[in-house]
Protein backbone atom coordinates (compact mmCIF):
# COMPACT_ATOMS: atom_id res chain seq x y z
CA UNK A 1 0.00 0.00 0.00
CA UNK A 2 1.05 3.61 -0.63
CA UNK A 3 1.08 5.43 2.70
CA UNK A 4 1.26 9.15 3.45
CA UNK A 5 2.45 9.84 6.99
CA UNK A 6 1.87 13.25 8.60
CA UNK A 7 3.78 13.83 11.84
CA UNK A 8 2.77 16.83 13.96
CA UNK A 9 4.02 18.19 17.28
CA UNK A 10 7.25 17.70 19.15
CA UNK A 11 10.43 15.72 18.52
CA UNK A 12 9.23 13.01 20.91
CA UNK A 13 6.18 12.51 18.72
CA UNK A 14 8.48 12.40 15.70
CA UNK A 15 10.33 9.43 17.22
CA UNK A 16 7.01 7.58 17.50
CA UNK A 17 6.35 8.42 13.85
CA UNK A 18 9.75 7.08 12.81
CA UNK A 19 9.13 3.85 14.72
CA UNK A 20 5.80 3.41 12.92
CA UNK A 21 7.42 4.18 9.56
CA UNK A 22 10.05 1.52 10.26
CA UNK A 23 7.35 -1.03 11.10
CA UNK A 24 5.40 -0.19 7.93
CA UNK A 25 8.47 -0.36 5.68
CA UNK A 26 9.34 -3.75 7.16
CA UNK A 27 5.77 -4.84 6.40
CA UNK A 28 6.24 -3.98 2.72
CA UNK A 29 4.39 -0.68 2.48
CA UNK A 30 5.61 2.24 0.34
CA UNK A 31 5.79 5.81 1.64
CA UNK A 32 4.59 8.69 -0.56
CA UNK A 33 4.66 12.48 -0.16
CA UNK A 34 1.57 13.23 -2.27
CA UNK A 35 -1.82 12.70 -0.63
CA UNK A 36 -3.41 12.11 -4.04
CA UNK A 37 -1.21 9.01 -4.43
CA UNK A 38 -1.95 7.57 -0.97
CA UNK A 39 -4.04 4.49 -0.26
CA UNK A 40 -3.71 5.10 3.49
CA UNK A 41 -3.05 8.34 5.37
CA UNK A 42 -1.77 8.28 8.96
CA UNK A 43 -1.75 11.45 11.08
CA UNK A 44 0.30 11.47 14.29
CA UNK A 45 -1.29 14.31 16.24
CA UNK A 46 -0.44 16.77 19.02
CA UNK A 47 -2.67 18.49 21.58
CA UNK A 48 -0.19 20.13 23.97
CA UNK A 49 -1.58 23.65 23.48
CA UNK A 50 -4.60 25.11 21.71
CA UNK A 51 -2.77 25.93 18.48
CA UNK A 52 -1.36 22.39 18.25
CA UNK A 53 -4.83 20.96 18.79
CA UNK A 54 -6.26 23.16 16.04
CA UNK A 55 -3.49 22.16 13.63
CA UNK A 56 -4.17 18.47 14.30
CA UNK A 57 -7.92 18.83 13.79
CA UNK A 58 -7.43 20.83 10.59
CA UNK A 59 -5.14 18.14 9.17
CA UNK A 60 -7.65 15.41 10.02
CA UNK A 61 -10.50 17.29 8.35
CA UNK A 62 -8.45 18.07 5.24
CA UNK A 63 -7.39 14.45 4.84
CA UNK A 64 -10.95 13.26 5.53
CA UNK A 65 -12.00 15.17 2.42
CA UNK A 66 -9.57 13.03 0.42
CA UNK A 67 -11.82 10.02 0.96
CA UNK A 68 -14.42 11.67 -1.25
CA UNK A 69 -12.11 11.36 -4.28
CA UNK A 70 -12.30 7.60 -4.11
CA UNK A 71 -8.60 6.64 -4.06
CA UNK A 72 -8.00 6.98 -0.32
CA UNK A 73 -8.97 3.72 1.33
CA UNK A 74 -8.26 4.49 4.98
CA UNK A 75 -7.54 7.38 7.36
CA UNK A 76 -5.84 6.56 10.67
CA UNK A 77 -5.30 9.00 13.55
CA UNK A 78 -2.79 8.43 16.35
CA UNK A 79 -0.83 10.48 18.89
CA UNK A 80 -1.82 12.76 21.75
CA UNK A 81 -5.04 14.18 20.28
CA UNK A 82 -6.16 10.63 19.50
CA UNK A 83 -5.44 9.52 23.06
CA UNK A 84 -7.24 12.47 24.60
CA UNK A 85 -10.28 12.72 22.31
CA UNK A 86 -10.67 9.18 21.01
CA UNK A 87 -14.45 8.95 21.39
CA UNK A 88 -15.04 12.42 19.95
CA UNK A 89 -12.95 11.65 16.85
CA UNK A 90 -14.78 8.37 16.23
CA UNK A 91 -18.20 9.97 16.72
CA UNK A 92 -17.71 13.30 14.96
CA UNK A 93 -15.40 12.41 12.05
CA UNK A 94 -16.80 9.20 10.51
CA UNK A 95 -14.17 9.32 7.74
CA UNK A 96 -11.58 8.26 10.33
CA UNK A 97 -11.24 4.48 10.12
CA UNK A 98 -9.10 3.88 13.21
CA UNK A 99 -7.80 5.73 16.27
CA UNK A 100 -4.60 4.58 18.01
CA UNK A 101 -3.50 5.73 21.45
CA UNK A 102 -0.05 6.98 22.39
CA UNK A 103 1.02 3.53 23.62
CA UNK A 104 -0.47 1.55 20.72
CA UNK A 105 1.67 2.67 17.78
CA UNK A 106 3.46 -0.68 17.58
CA UNK A 107 0.11 -2.08 16.37
CA UNK A 108 0.10 0.14 13.26
CA UNK A 109 0.65 -2.65 10.70
CA UNK A 110 -2.09 -4.77 12.29
CA UNK A 111 -4.45 -1.78 12.28
CA UNK A 112 -3.85 -1.14 8.57
CA UNK A 113 -4.62 -4.77 7.81
CA UNK A 114 -7.79 -4.44 9.86
CA UNK A 115 -9.15 -1.25 8.29
CA UNK A 116 -8.55 -2.64 4.80
CA UNK A 117 -10.22 -5.96 5.59
CA UNK A 118 -13.42 -7.03 3.83
CA UNK A 119 -14.69 -8.23 7.20
CA UNK A 120 -16.81 -5.70 9.12
CA UNK A 121 -15.81 -7.48 12.34
CA UNK A 122 -12.09 -7.04 11.67
CA UNK A 123 -12.60 -3.39 10.76
CA UNK A 124 -14.56 -2.88 13.97
CA UNK A 125 -11.91 -4.61 16.06
CA UNK A 126 -9.25 -2.02 15.16
CA UNK A 127 -11.48 1.08 15.06
CA UNK A 128 -10.37 2.02 18.56
CA UNK A 129 -6.93 0.58 19.39
CA UNK A 130 -5.93 1.59 22.90
CA UNK A 131 -3.56 0.16 25.51
CA UNK A 132 -3.06 1.31 29.08
CA UNK A 133 -1.59 4.81 29.05
CA UNK A 134 1.23 3.60 31.35
CA UNK A 135 2.25 0.78 28.99
CA UNK A 136 5.73 1.30 27.51
CA UNK A 137 6.11 0.17 23.89
CA UNK A 138 9.62 -1.19 23.32
CA UNK A 139 9.75 -2.06 19.65
CA UNK A 140 12.22 -2.93 16.92
CA UNK A 141 15.05 -0.40 17.14
CA UNK A 142 15.29 0.03 13.35
CA UNK A 143 13.43 3.30 12.81
CA UNK A 144 13.02 5.18 9.56
CA UNK A 145 14.92 8.39 10.29
CA UNK A 146 13.23 11.42 8.72
CA UNK A 147 15.62 14.17 9.84
CA UNK A 148 18.06 13.93 6.95
CA UNK A 149 20.18 11.07 8.24
CA UNK A 150 22.95 13.05 9.95
CA UNK A 151 21.10 13.73 13.21
CA UNK A 152 18.37 11.86 15.06
CA UNK A 153 16.43 11.98 18.30
CA UNK A 154 16.68 9.25 20.93
CA UNK A 155 13.63 9.11 23.21
CA UNK A 156 14.95 7.80 26.51
CA UNK A 157 11.71 7.86 28.51
CA UNK A 158 7.97 8.27 28.17
CA UNK A 159 5.41 10.12 30.30
CA UNK A 160 5.85 12.43 33.28
CA UNK A 161 5.28 12.36 37.05
CA UNK A 162 5.48 16.11 37.66
CA UNK A 163 1.78 16.98 37.06
CA UNK A 164 2.30 20.71 36.54
CA UNK A 165 -1.05 22.46 36.86
CA UNK A 166 -1.14 23.66 33.23
CA UNK A 167 -0.04 20.44 31.54
CA UNK A 168 -2.10 17.63 30.01
CA UNK A 169 0.89 15.37 29.24
CA UNK A 170 0.52 12.92 32.18
CA UNK A 171 -3.07 12.26 31.09
CA UNK A 172 -2.16 11.48 27.47
CA UNK A 173 1.33 10.02 27.96
CA UNK A 174 1.08 8.40 31.38
CA UNK A 175 3.52 8.27 34.27
CA UNK A 176 7.28 8.51 33.77
CA UNK A 177 8.76 5.29 32.33
CA UNK A 178 12.41 4.92 31.36
CA UNK A 179 13.38 2.88 28.31
CA UNK A 180 15.83 0.11 29.37
CA UNK A 181 19.42 1.18 28.80
CA UNK A 182 20.32 -1.86 26.71
CA UNK A 183 17.49 -1.05 24.29
CA UNK A 184 18.65 2.57 23.98
CA UNK A 185 22.24 1.54 23.31
CA UNK A 186 21.10 -0.87 20.59
CA UNK A 187 18.94 1.82 19.02
CA UNK A 188 21.76 4.37 19.18
CA UNK A 189 24.17 1.90 17.58
CA UNK A 190 21.71 1.27 14.75
CA UNK A 191 21.35 5.01 14.21
CA UNK A 192 25.13 5.49 14.15
CA UNK A 193 25.52 2.57 11.74
CA UNK A 194 23.00 4.34 9.49
CA UNK A 195 25.09 7.50 9.36
CA UNK A 196 23.75 9.54 12.27
CA UNK A 197 26.45 11.80 13.70
CA UNK A 198 24.45 13.85 16.20
CA UNK A 199 22.24 12.11 18.76
CA UNK A 200 19.71 14.28 20.59
CA UNK A 201 18.30 12.87 23.83
CA UNK A 202 14.64 13.69 24.45
CA UNK A 203 11.91 12.80 26.94
CA UNK A 204 9.33 14.75 28.88
CA UNK A 205 12.16 15.01 31.41
CA UNK A 206 15.56 13.55 30.56
CA UNK A 207 17.16 14.27 33.94
CA UNK A 208 14.95 11.70 35.72
CA UNK A 209 16.07 8.87 33.46
CA UNK A 210 16.43 5.58 35.32
CA UNK A 211 14.67 6.49 38.57
CA UNK A 212 11.77 4.11 37.91
CA UNK A 213 13.85 1.23 36.52
CA UNK A 214 17.01 1.39 38.60
CA UNK A 215 16.00 3.36 41.69
CA UNK A 216 18.40 6.19 40.87
CA UNK A 217 19.16 8.74 38.18
CA UNK A 218 21.11 6.99 35.44
CA UNK A 219 21.45 9.72 32.81
CA UNK A 220 25.19 10.13 33.51
CA UNK A 221 25.78 6.40 33.03
CA UNK A 222 23.70 6.37 29.85
CA UNK A 223 25.67 9.29 28.47
CA UNK A 224 29.02 7.63 29.14
CA UNK A 225 27.83 4.46 27.40
CA UNK A 226 26.54 6.41 24.39
CA UNK A 227 29.85 8.23 24.10
CA UNK A 228 31.55 4.88 23.40
CA UNK A 229 29.55 4.35 20.20
CA UNK A 230 31.78 4.97 17.21
CA UNK A 231 30.39 7.22 14.51
CA UNK A 232 28.63 9.59 16.88
CA UNK A 233 30.30 13.02 17.04
CA UNK A 234 27.80 15.07 19.05
CA UNK A 235 25.40 14.09 21.83
CA UNK A 236 22.91 16.77 22.85
CA UNK A 237 20.54 16.77 25.85
CA UNK A 238 17.11 18.43 25.79
CA UNK A 239 14.35 18.79 28.42
CA UNK A 240 16.49 18.95 31.57
CA UNK A 241 14.60 20.06 34.66
CA UNK A 242 16.96 22.40 36.56
CA UNK A 243 16.11 21.00 39.99
CA UNK A 244 17.13 17.49 38.85
CA UNK A 245 20.57 18.40 37.50
CA UNK A 246 23.23 16.71 39.61
CA UNK A 247 26.94 17.33 40.08
CA UNK A 248 27.54 13.93 38.47
CA UNK A 249 25.70 15.00 35.33
CA UNK A 250 27.68 18.23 35.14
CA UNK A 251 30.92 16.28 35.53
CA UNK A 252 30.01 13.92 32.67
CA UNK A 253 29.23 16.85 30.37
CA UNK A 254 32.61 18.39 31.28
CA UNK A 255 34.61 15.20 30.78
CA UNK A 256 33.09 13.63 27.67
CA UNK A 257 34.15 15.45 24.49
CA UNK A 258 31.21 14.12 22.46
CA UNK A 259 28.62 15.76 24.71
CA UNK A 260 27.67 19.22 23.48
CA UNK A 261 28.13 21.99 26.02
CA UNK A 262 24.44 22.79 25.64
CA UNK A 263 21.45 22.24 27.90
CA UNK A 264 17.76 22.89 27.42
CA UNK A 265 16.22 23.99 30.74
CA UNK A 266 12.43 24.49 30.50
CA UNK A 267 11.98 26.74 33.54
CA UNK A 268 8.57 28.27 32.50
CA UNK A 269 8.77 31.22 34.93
CA UNK A 270 10.95 32.88 37.57
CA UNK A 271 8.45 34.38 40.01
CA UNK A 272 8.11 32.19 43.10
CA UNK A 273 4.38 32.90 43.26
CA UNK A 274 3.77 31.77 39.68
CA UNK A 275 6.11 28.79 40.00
CA UNK A 276 4.05 27.63 42.98
CA UNK A 277 0.76 28.06 41.10
CA UNK A 278 2.23 26.13 38.20
CA UNK A 279 3.16 23.25 40.49
CA UNK A 280 6.84 23.61 39.63
CA UNK A 281 9.27 22.19 42.18
CA UNK A 282 11.84 24.94 42.21
CA UNK A 283 12.30 28.61 43.09
CA UNK A 284 13.89 31.69 41.57
CA UNK A 285 16.87 31.37 43.92
CA UNK A 286 17.37 27.70 43.05
CA UNK A 287 17.18 28.47 39.33
CA UNK A 288 19.84 31.15 39.66
CA UNK A 289 22.04 28.82 41.72
CA UNK A 290 21.81 26.04 39.11
CA UNK A 291 22.48 28.35 36.17
CA UNK A 292 25.45 29.97 37.89
CA UNK A 293 26.88 26.55 38.79
CA UNK A 294 26.55 25.34 35.18
CA UNK A 295 28.33 28.42 33.87
CA UNK A 296 31.00 28.23 36.54
CA UNK A 297 31.75 24.55 35.85
CA UNK A 298 31.31 24.72 32.04
CA UNK A 299 32.14 28.30 31.01
CA UNK A 300 31.27 27.85 27.32
CA UNK A 301 27.91 26.15 27.94
CA UNK A 302 24.93 27.35 25.90
CA UNK A 303 21.66 27.44 27.82
CA UNK A 304 18.23 27.35 26.24
CA UNK A 305 14.93 27.80 28.06
CA UNK A 306 11.20 28.14 27.45
CA UNK A 307 8.81 30.39 29.34
CA UNK A 308 5.05 30.69 29.77
CA UNK A 309 3.65 34.20 30.04
CA UNK A 310 0.13 35.18 31.04
CA UNK A 311 -0.38 32.31 33.48
CA UNK A 312 -3.56 32.74 35.58
CA UNK A 313 -3.01 35.32 38.30
CA UNK A 314 0.24 36.66 36.82
CA UNK A 315 0.47 40.28 37.94
CA UNK A 316 2.38 43.03 36.20
CA UNK A 317 4.90 42.87 39.04
CA UNK A 318 5.43 39.14 38.48
CA UNK A 319 5.84 39.74 34.75
CA UNK A 320 8.51 42.32 35.56
CA UNK A 321 10.18 39.77 37.86
CA UNK A 322 10.41 37.45 34.86
CA UNK A 323 11.73 40.24 32.64
CA UNK A 324 14.39 41.03 35.24
CA UNK A 325 15.35 37.36 35.47
CA UNK A 326 15.75 37.04 31.68
CA UNK A 327 17.81 40.22 31.61
CA UNK A 328 20.00 38.96 34.45
CA UNK A 329 20.51 35.39 33.17
CA UNK A 330 21.14 36.25 29.49
CA UNK A 331 20.07 32.90 28.07
CA UNK A 332 21.66 31.93 24.77
CA UNK A 333 18.34 30.69 23.41
CA UNK A 334 14.83 31.40 24.68
CA UNK A 335 11.27 30.76 23.54
CA UNK A 336 8.08 32.21 25.03
CA UNK A 337 4.60 30.67 24.89
CA UNK A 338 1.45 32.47 25.94
CA UNK A 339 -0.49 30.43 28.48
CA UNK A 340 -3.03 28.14 26.82
CA UNK A 341 -5.82 26.86 29.11
CA UNK A 342 -6.25 23.11 28.69
CA UNK A 343 -9.42 21.43 29.85
CA UNK A 344 -9.04 18.90 32.68
CA UNK A 345 -6.04 20.76 34.11
CA UNK A 346 -6.15 22.67 37.43
CA UNK A 347 -4.86 25.89 35.86
CA UNK A 348 -7.77 26.08 33.42
CA UNK A 349 -10.21 26.68 36.28
CA UNK A 350 -8.00 29.01 38.30
CA UNK A 351 -9.32 32.54 38.94
CA UNK A 352 -7.78 35.65 37.40
CA UNK A 353 -7.32 34.35 33.86
CA UNK A 354 -5.26 36.83 31.83
CA UNK A 355 -6.77 38.44 28.68
CA UNK A 356 -5.20 37.30 25.41
CA UNK A 357 -4.06 40.78 24.46
CA UNK A 358 -2.15 41.11 27.76
CA UNK A 359 -0.51 37.70 27.22
CA UNK A 360 0.59 38.73 23.75
CA UNK A 361 1.94 42.07 24.96
CA UNK A 362 4.00 40.35 27.65
CA UNK A 363 5.24 37.75 25.18
CA UNK A 364 6.36 40.52 22.81
CA UNK A 365 8.18 42.34 25.62
CA UNK A 366 10.06 39.20 26.62
CA UNK A 367 11.04 38.38 23.05
CA UNK A 368 12.18 41.94 22.39
CA UNK A 369 14.40 41.76 25.47
CA UNK A 370 15.78 38.38 24.43
CA UNK A 371 16.40 39.65 20.91
CA UNK A 372 18.65 42.40 22.28
CA UNK A 373 20.53 39.82 24.37
CA UNK A 374 21.04 37.45 21.44
CA UNK A 375 22.12 40.24 19.09
CA UNK A 376 24.78 41.35 21.58
CA UNK A 377 25.96 37.75 22.00
CA UNK A 378 26.14 37.28 18.23
CA UNK A 379 28.30 40.39 17.85
CA UNK A 380 30.65 39.00 20.49
CA UNK A 381 31.03 35.79 18.44
CA UNK A 382 32.54 37.61 15.46
CA UNK A 383 36.11 36.43 15.01
CA UNK A 384 35.56 33.10 16.78
CA UNK A 385 36.44 29.80 15.08
CA UNK A 386 33.67 27.23 15.51
CA UNK A 387 33.05 23.63 14.54
CA UNK A 388 29.93 23.51 12.36
CA UNK A 389 27.74 20.61 11.29
CA UNK A 390 26.62 21.26 7.71
CA UNK A 391 22.86 20.92 7.14
CA UNK A 392 22.67 21.70 3.43
CA UNK A 393 23.46 24.07 0.58
CA UNK A 394 21.89 27.48 0.08
CA UNK A 395 20.18 27.43 -3.32
CA UNK A 396 22.00 29.30 -6.12
CA UNK A 397 24.76 30.55 -3.82
CA UNK A 398 28.27 29.51 -2.84
CA UNK A 399 27.13 29.02 0.71
CA UNK A 400 25.94 26.35 3.10
CA UNK A 401 23.81 26.40 6.21
CA UNK A 402 24.86 24.64 9.39
CA UNK A 403 24.70 24.53 13.17
CA UNK A 404 27.23 24.91 15.96
CA UNK A 405 27.15 23.00 19.25
CA UNK A 406 25.11 25.93 20.57
CA UNK A 407 22.20 25.22 18.22
CA UNK A 408 19.64 22.42 18.38
CA UNK A 409 17.84 21.74 15.09
CA UNK A 410 14.58 23.52 14.28
CA UNK A 411 14.47 25.65 17.44
CA UNK A 412 17.78 27.54 17.53
CA UNK A 413 19.84 29.66 15.15
CA UNK A 414 21.92 28.73 12.12
CA UNK A 415 25.27 29.72 10.68
CA UNK A 416 25.66 30.52 6.98
CA UNK A 417 29.02 29.35 5.67
CA UNK A 418 30.47 31.04 2.58
CA UNK A 419 32.66 28.74 0.50
CA UNK A 420 33.05 27.46 -3.05
CA UNK A 421 34.16 24.06 -1.75
CA UNK A 422 31.85 21.06 -2.00
CA UNK A 423 30.33 20.05 1.34
CA UNK A 424 27.75 17.42 2.26
CA UNK A 425 25.01 17.32 4.88
CA UNK A 426 26.51 15.89 8.05
CA UNK A 427 30.03 17.10 7.31
CA UNK A 428 31.84 18.92 10.09
CA UNK A 429 33.71 22.05 9.10
CA UNK A 430 35.85 24.64 10.89
CA UNK A 431 34.34 28.07 10.31
CA UNK A 432 35.39 31.60 11.26
CA UNK A 433 32.49 33.86 12.24
CA UNK A 434 32.52 37.05 10.17
CA UNK A 435 29.11 38.55 10.87
CA UNK A 436 25.66 38.18 12.34
CA UNK A 437 22.12 38.54 11.01
CA UNK A 438 19.29 38.52 13.54
CA UNK A 439 19.47 35.16 15.37
CA UNK A 440 21.94 33.65 12.88
CA UNK A 441 25.67 33.89 12.26
CA UNK A 442 27.66 34.28 9.04
CA UNK A 443 31.06 32.71 8.55
CA UNK A 444 33.78 31.58 6.17
CA UNK A 445 35.19 28.09 5.78
CA UNK A 446 38.71 27.74 7.13
Where in this protein do the model-derived segments appear?
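Short glycine-enriched, charge-decorated loop/helix-capping segments at active-site entrances
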Residues: 47-48, 173-174, 213-216, 276-282, ...
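Conserved beta-strand core positions
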Residues: 3, 40-41, 152, 199, ...
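Conserved, mostly hydrophobic/aromatic
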Residues: 164, 184, 201, 237, ...
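Proteins enriched for Cys/Gly/acidic motifs involved in redox and nucleic-acid/cofactor modification
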Residues: 1-209, 248, 259, 263, ...
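Terminal RNA-binding accessory module
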Residues: 349-446
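Conserved SAM/AdoMet-binding glycine-rich loop
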Residues: 75-77, 84, 193-319, 327
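Generic beta-strand/beta-sheet core signal
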Residues: 6, 202-204, 238-240, 266-268, ...
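Extended hydrophobic-aromatic, low-complexity segments
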Residues: 261-262, 275-276, 287, 299-302, ...
